[in-house]
Amino acid sequence: EAQPYLEAIRQLRNELGPRNSLTSHLTLVPYLRAAGELKTKPTQHSVKELLAHGLQPDTIICRSERSLDADIRRKISLFCNVDQEAVIQMLDAETIYEVPLLLRDEGIGELVVDRLFTEQEQDRFATTPDLDAWIDFLKRLKNPTVTIPIALVGKYVEHQDAYKSITESFILAGVPDEVQ
């Protein structure tokens, strides 16, 4: 199913050149409670699949419920042929709106700037982005002061994601006024 997309990415990357593109691979690094460890094999296999389609990721973003220690990062780096600092941890987040802050904390911005811009161009990115408004948005989202019950009538209401766009729009509409 994904083959046409992978081929399009491969062709685009060849046309743009390595200094004008960056490929990030998002992968799950599951924690197996029975073994008490994070498993990197699924990540290694998915990168090998990408390689079979002619794509070598520049960064690997590792979703996980547990932190990646230095040994896990080293292992992923070694077996997936990426720099160790390009192995980015993405811990499970309470809300998707936390993801930009988690990525910032992992240094992905600096990694992207280093990869795509010359040293002279990098000066434009020397200042830290002001994320105060985003942090305020998150605070309001996670700590509503008022709750308003809303009934949703539909055919598939028992399926949690059936009306996801509607429920998400209600949530977002309430954020400025700290309403849930």
What residues fall within each predicted segment?
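N-terminal beta1-alpha1 cap of cysteine-dependent amidohydrolase-like domains
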Residues: E1-Q180
